[in-house]
Amino acid sequence: MPRRGLVAGPDLDNFQRRYFTPSEVAEHNQLEDLWVSYLGFVYNLTPLVEEFKGDLLLKPILEVAGQDISHWFDPQTRDIRKHIDPLTGCMRYRTPRGRFVHIPPPLPRSDWANDFGVPWWKGANYQVGRLSARTRNIRIINTLATQEHTLQVGAQESMWEILHRYLPYNAHAASYTWKYDGKNLNMDQTLEENGIRDEEEEFDYLNMDGKLHTPAILLYFNDDLTEL
C-alpha cells in the first residue's frame, strides 16, 4: 500500500537527492563514514577505506575526511595535478600530503599492484550527488502543529528535494500543501523559480543580518488518509 496516499509526486521511500551542502559532506568525517567533494561532485569513499583498511596509503585521504579536495585536481583534465619530479625528471602526480591509494610510487617497484583498473577518483563508482554551489536558509512552518524549522538547502534543489530534507521533522510532509505568499508552490521547481528570492547578498550590501528575514514556507494539511 503506497505510504503517500493520494498525494501526487515521486516515491519518497526510494527518492534520490541530487545535491548535498558542504555542511552535510562535513558530517561524514569518520573512518567508517567518509565523504569528500571535488570538482562539484560528492563522493562516498567509505567502501574504498574499508577495502584498504590499515594501509598507510589511506592516511592522506583520512586527513581530508568531510572536506572539499578540488585543489588536488587539474580542472581541465579532472585528474590529480602533476609536476616534474626533481629526482627523476619525469612527470608524476603531485601529492604534497604523501602518496595515497592508486597513486603509483615514484620509482618502479615489484610490490606495487596496478591491476585495480580505474583509479578511485576517475570513475563514478563512489559518486553520490552534486555539491551545492550556493546554499540558503528557509523556514518551514507547519500550520497544523504550529511548528517551525529552519533548513539549510541548496539553491538548485527542487521543492521535492527540500521536502525530502524536511521528512525527519514530519514524516507526512507530502500530505501538506506547500505555500509561499498565499500561492501554491510548484514542487518540481526551485525556490527561486517559485518566486522565493535569495536576498542574502542584498542584506550583506546593506550591512544587515539576513537571518532577520528568512523566507517562510507555510504547510497546510490535506486529509489524504496517509495518517491511517
UniProtKB/Swiss-Prot annotation:
Keyword Heme: yes
Binding annotation for heme: 83
PROSITE patterns reported for this sequence: CYTOCHROME_B5_2 (PS50255)
InterPro entries from the UniProt entry: Cyt_B5-like_heme/steroid-bd, Cyt_B5-like_heme/steroid_sf, Cytochrome_b5_domain
UniProt keyword list: Cell projection, Cytoplasm, Cytoskeleton, Heme, Iron, Metal-binding
Domain Cytochrome b5 heme-binding: 17-83
Superkingdom of this protein's organism: Eukaryota
GO cellular component, one term: cytoskeleton
Keyword Metal-binding part of the UniProt annotation: yes
Function: Radial spoke stalk protein that binds heme under oxidizing conditions. Required for the coordinated beating of multiple cilia maybe by functioning in a redox signaling pathway.
PANTHER family: CYTOCHROME B5 DOMAIN-CONTAINING PROTEIN 1
Homology family: Belongs to the cytochrome b5 family.
Protein name: Cytochrome b5 domain-containing protein 1
Organism per entry: Mus musculus
Gene field: Cyb5d1
